Regions:
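Flexible, glycine/small-residue-enriched loop-and-beta-strand segment within the central core
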Residues: 1-48, 57, 75-76, 80-88
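Short acidic capping loops at alpha-helix termini that bridge into adjacent secondary structure
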Residues: 33, 51-52, 68-69
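Acidic, glycine-centered active-site loop in nucleotide-sugar glycosyltransferases
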Residues: 66-76
Length: 89
């Protein structure tokens, strides 16, 4: 399972600002197992988040988080800790 807390925003689309009509483009967001996306976090299009990751409240995720069982926070996010892998089911 994965937990997505209140106010989190997963934005899988954007617009081409060089297009005269701001053409929409999309990329899927992939989130692994045992992930916690904390409150008010923004995750940008095309981002992949590995299993067991925690993303701290009000963080901005614009790049993949590939290292499993880590804790990330900030604008943009950076790794601030690690989790115990034994916590998973």
């Amino acid at each position: 399972y994965t937990t997505v807390s209140q106010g989190a925003h997963l934005c899988a689309g954007s617009h081409d600002f060089n297009s005269p009509n701001f053409q929409l483009y999309t990329k899927p967001i992939t989130i692994g197992k045992n992930v916690w996306i904390c409150a008010d976090t923004f995750i940008s299009l095309g981002v992949c988040i590995a299993d067991g990751v925690v993303v701290g409240a009000r963080s901005l995720v614009v790049k993949n988080i590939c290292q499993p069982w880590t804790v990330h926070a900030g604008h943009p996010t950076k790794q601030i800790g690690k989790r115990k892998e034994t916590l998973h089911d």
